[in-house]
């Protein structure tokens, strides 16, 4: 009986190993939610408060959804974003940082802007949450 229980434990471990998304996968999902203008999923995948440091200016928002204005984004020419580089800087049990380079594109698939950002993620209730973004240079969130 003891062997059977051990067998079941070892066999079930891989089933649960894939349930937790990596920090890099979490950021990829975050970009997908952004492209879909899915404010509820963005808020669910981010920590509260959410902090952006853009061009050296730190701003805290109650939720990520409070930081972005999709109508303003569209007015700036944005249609969608695409990640070019997604590198894990570090990861421990409670935090991680991911280095991202991405571009924003317009409706004609032309690059509107290209930006480097480092995202800070925290582990909350068994899931990675995007807690903050550190943007090199300027980046509109549609509220300008």
Which residue stretches match the model-derived regions?
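Sec-dependent signal peptide recognition
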Residues: 1-7
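A mature extracytoplasmic/lumenal domain signature
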Residues: 46, 56, 100-104, 117-119, ...
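Short, low-complexity N-terminal intrinsically disordered segments enriched in polar/charged residues
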Residues: 8, 12-40, 44
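A short gly/proline-enriched turn/hairpin at secondary-structure junctions
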Residues: 46-61, 76
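Beta-strand elements of well-folded, non-transmembrane domains
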Residues: 35, 104-106, 121
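Surface-exposed, charged secondary-structure patches
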Residues: 67-110
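Short beta-strand edge/turn micro-motifs at domain boundaries
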Residues: 114-144
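Hydrophobic pocket/interface hotspot
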Residues: 30, 41-42, 50, 98, ...
């Amino acid at each position: 009986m003891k062997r059977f229980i051990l067998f079941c434990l070892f066999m079930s471990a891989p089933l649960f190993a894939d349930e937790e998304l990596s920090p890099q996968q979490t950021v990829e999902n975050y970009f997908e939610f952004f492209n879909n203008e899915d404010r509820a999923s963005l808020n669910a995948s981010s920590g509260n408060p959410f902090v952006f440091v853009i061009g050296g200016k730190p701003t805290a928002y109650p939720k990520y959804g409070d930081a972005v204005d999709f109508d303003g984004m569209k007015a700036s020419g944005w249609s969608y974003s695409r990640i070019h580089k997604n590198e894990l800087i570090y990861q421990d049990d409670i935090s991680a940082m991911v280095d991202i380079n991405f571009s924003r594109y317009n409706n004609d698939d032309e690059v509107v802007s290209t930006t480097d950002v480092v995202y800070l993620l925290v582990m909350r209730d068994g899931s990675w949450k995007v807690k903050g973004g550190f943007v090199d240079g300027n980046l509109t969130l549609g509220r300008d």
